[in-house]
Amino acid sequence: MTLLALGINHKTAPVSLRERVSFSPDKLDQALDSLLAQPMVQAGVVLSTCNRTELYLSVEERDDLQEALIRWLCDYHNLNEDDLRNSLYWHQDNDAVSHLMRVASGLDSLVLGEPQILGQVKKAFADSQKGHMKASELERMFQKSFSVAKRVRTETDIGASAVSVAFAACTLARQIFESLSTVTVLLVGAGETIELVARHLREHKVQKMIIANRTRERAQILADEVGAEVIALSDIDERLREADIIISSTASPLPIIGKGMVERALKSRRNQPMLLVDIAVPRDVEPEVGKLANAYLYSVDDLQSIISHNLAQRKAAAVEAETIVAQEASEFMAWLRAQSASETIRDYRSQAEQVRDELTAKALAALEQGGDAQTIMQDLAWKLTNRLIHAPTKSLQQAARDGDNERLNILRDSLGLE
């Protein structure tokens, strides 16, 4: 059994590739079923966010393992293997464990130390448990990563400063508009990122917020909290002209805001500028919108410079966090190896007990038939000794024939021979 982590993220692939490799929430079960149908995959978790798509797997070793998994990923998303191969990373065993711990702790995020990723990892794990999780090793790896992420946040200052994609989006808005108290903001979506954006905007006393979402009920809960108006996604075309700032983050597989829609809104606004911040993957706003005069479009990749400005105080904490992760990953792999040894020990003991029970039963039967006790006991001892040392003897003989002194020494040590 081997633990794997493979995927792409904001550091290895642009948004144009990440959106093609992402898994939509409504098709996640189908993707997991397809993944687990691969003969080498024992268990799997799919993590798909705006900044990364990753597969965490428990697999059986085989020579073409990497090629088979890349082929599955490309076939599933209808991608050319060459397009994906150069952006794909691949981690195995200790490196896979360390990678997941870093991801869950926010050490591999676009925003160093951001807490939202832990919730996303937990959700990915929970989704995988709906009939998909089969290997205790993978499950244990995730559970351990959750506790490591908590330890990192508790023992370091990695989360001391409030920087996130949501915070960066609001920072961008405040840089472009002198005061948010005079602007109207349209938020598209009502997920965790938009919730954070809405709370940031409320703190900066934005004049008006409108929330457009597929399901009104979820949006209404957020709207009640931040004092916003709720509209349907179908109303965006009509209401877009009111918005000075549009911040969008949905799980829609297709753009929600198109170039024509923005053109009409700008015309109604007499070309007053609009800021559009698209933090969704796949993108919610057609890229062509950025070519329009007075429409200022920023994608999640464009937020990098803003985010980088806020990272200085987290870098020292990240060094401490990396030390914790390295220690915890090493301890987890030691535990995993111990589990493997425990299984071998159980099998060996069970085998010895079967031999003991079999030969003891024969000896007792011979005694009941009136056989000589001393002869029967000597025969039992002789047969028991021969049966128990047979396999080690064969291994020692084979190692000697092969000239494998290292194996001979290991066997001598295992048998307690000086």
Curated annotation (Swiss-Prot):
GO terms for molecular function: glutamyl-tRNA reductase activity; NADP binding. Substrate binds at T49, C50, N51, R52, S109, E114, P115, Q116, Q120. It catalyses: (S)-4-amino-5-oxopentanoate + tRNA(Glu) + NADP(+) = L-glutamyl-tRNA(Glu) + NADPH + H(+). It is an enzyme of class 1 (oxidoreductase). Its EC number is 1.2.1.70. Pfam families: GlutR_dimer, GlutR_N, Shikimate_DH. Keywords: NADP, Oxidoreductase, Porphyrin biosynthesis. GO terms for biological process: protoporphyrinogen IX biosynthetic process from glutamate. Pathway: Porphyrin-containing compound metabolism; protoporphyrin-IX biosynthesis; 5-aminolevulinate from L-glutamyl-tRNA(Glu): step 1/2. The record marks H99 as: Important for activity. Coiled coil: none annotated. NADP(+) binds at G189, A190, G191, E192, T193, I194. The keyword NADP applies. Homodimer. Belongs to the glutamyl-tRNA reductase family. HAMAP family: Glu_tRNA_reductase. During catalysis, the active site Cys acts as a nucleophile attacking the alpha-carbonyl group of tRNA-bound glutamate with the formation of a thioester intermediate between enzyme and glutamate, and the concomitant release of tRNA(Glu). The thioester intermediate is finally reduced by direct hydride transfer from NADPH, to form the product GSA. Catalyzes the NADPH-dependent reduction of glutamyl-tRNA(Glu) to glutamate 1-semialdehyde (GSA). Possesses an unusual extended V-shaped dimeric structure with each monomer consisting of three distinct domains arranged along a curved 'spinal' alpha-helix. The N-terminal catalytic domain specifically recognizes the glutamate moiety of the substrate. The second domain is the NADPH-binding domain, and the third C-terminal domain is responsible for dimerization. PANTHER family: GLUTAMYL-TRNA REDUCTASE. This is Glutamyl-tRNA reductase. It comes from Escherichia coli O6:K15:H31 (strain 536 / UPEC). The gene is hemA.
